[in-house]
Amino acid sequence: MQNTCTLNKKNSYSYDDLLASGRGELFGKEGPQLPAPTMLMMDRIVEMNEETGTFGKGYIEAELDIKPELPFFGCHFIGDPVMPGCLGLDAMWQLVGFYLGWIGGKGKGRALGVGEVKFTGQILPTAKKVVYRIHMKRVINRKLVMGMADGEVEVDGRVIYTATDLKVGLFQDTSAF
């Protein structure tokens, strides 16, 4: 798949770049978009490429700086604040969709599933940094563009979530989805 947005194809992206993606400015109005804050689950993408990763088909690494004032800590749970695990899973889906746009895919991104997710730790407001790592396994470029990847979430140097077979599709029309 050829990237038609070569001007925007970099190996790392700042927070401002990620916000531009949410406005449809990074990969164009027909490319996938990241969500806006407060659902944007990363502050930067520190590495992206098409050649490495566990399967040699692409790798993405992104980071989220943890601050006690992040909105989810105030409500999940009162007196026992913890980042919802589903937000870490969503961050991995967000990154697979971003990758599809980065390689030139067009359409609106939708999570399609995950093979298996394991949670072996938690993200507390006392943590400093979350690192997301995505290892692309496959990209299908037909009527539906779909990416499949494995991923992990690390907090302060310890892997706490793993996911296999993360699937994201890019749809030209989401009305029947």
UniProtKB/Swiss-Prot annotation:
UniProtKB keywords: Cytoplasm, Fatty acid biosynthesis, Fatty acid metabolism, Isomerase, Lipid biosynthesis, Lipid metabolism, Lyase
Protein name in the entry: 3-hydroxydecanoyl-[acyl-carrier-protein] dehydratase
Active site (catalytic residues): H76
Function summary: Necessary for the introduction of cis unsaturation into fatty acids. Catalyzes the dehydration of (3R)-3-hydroxydecanoyl-ACP to E-(2)-decenoyl-ACP and then its isomerization to Z-(3)-decenoyl-ACP. Can catalyze the dehydratase reaction for beta-hydroxyacyl-ACPs with saturated chain lengths up to 16:0, being most active on intermediate chain length.
A Pfam family the protein falls into: FabA
Natural source organism: Haemophilus influenzae (strain 86-028NP)
Subunit and interaction comment: Homodimer.
Keyword presence, Cytoplasm: yes
An annotated Gene Ontology molecular function: (3R)-hydroxyacyl-[acyl-carrier-protein] dehydratase activity
GO cellular component, one term: cytoplasm
Family: Belongs to the thioester dehydratase family. FabA subfamily.
Gene: fabA
Metabolic or biological pathway, per its Swiss-Prot or TrEMBL entry: Lipid metabolism; fatty acid biosynthesis
Keyword Lyase: yes
GO terms classed as biological process: unsaturated fatty acid biosynthetic process
